Amino acid sequence: YQGIAMGNKDSKQVYLTFDEGYEAGYTEKILDVLKENEVKAAFFITAHYVNTNADLVKRMLEEGHIVGNHTVNHKSMPDLSLEEIKKEVMDLHTSIYERFGYEMKYIRPPKGEYSERTVAYCQSLGYTTVMWSFAYDDWNEDAQKGESYAKKKILDNIHSGAVILLHGNSKDNSNVLAECIQEIKAQGYTFSTLDQFER
C-alpha cells in the first residue's frame, strides 16, 4: 500500500516528522530552529490542534513544511468502521483545505495503530500512511528525562532512511533539536521531505 516507515538504506537521507496533538508552547521554537537550519519537516496535526493553533499551522505551511493528517479526534483506526474513518480523516482534510487552501496527503494513524484495512482505505481516500523507524518516550510531559537523554536517544538512532518521530510537546526535544540537526548534518546526512521520499 505504499506506506512509509523507513527510507532507502543506501541513501543518506533522513526525514523529520512531528506529531502535534495539542500545543505545549514549544512548536514556535521548533519552527525557529528548522528555519535557522534550513530543514523542512512534516507536522501531523489533529482537529484540536488546528482549532487552537491556526496561526502555527499557517506558519508551518508558509515556511514550506508538510502538514499531515493525524485525524479529528485521535482515535485508534482499527477500532473504527470505514464510515467513521472517513469522517475522522476527511472532516479534518476539508477543514484544512477550507482554511488554508492546502490539500493534505499524508496521514499518521493515531497511536501508530493501523491494519491492512485502514491503510488501504486511507489510500483510497488519497492518503499515504506514514509510520516511523524511530520514536522514543518523549511525549509524556511529566516524565521528560533530560536534554542529554533526548539528544543521545535521537543521535544513537540515526541511520540512512530514518523516519524520525518527535512530539511537539516535548520540552527536551525542542531544546536539543538544533544541536541534533547540526550533528546529523555533520555526519553527512541530508534532511529530506516526505515528498522526496526514497524507497
Predicted regions and their residues:
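Alpha-helical scaffold elements lining the catalytic groove of polysaccharide deacetylases
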Residues: 24-29, 75-103, 113-160, 173-179
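Structured helix-beta-strand junction loops
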Residues: 37, 63-64, 125, 160-161, ...
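Short secondary-structure boundary segments
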Residues: 111, 132-134, 167-168, 195-196
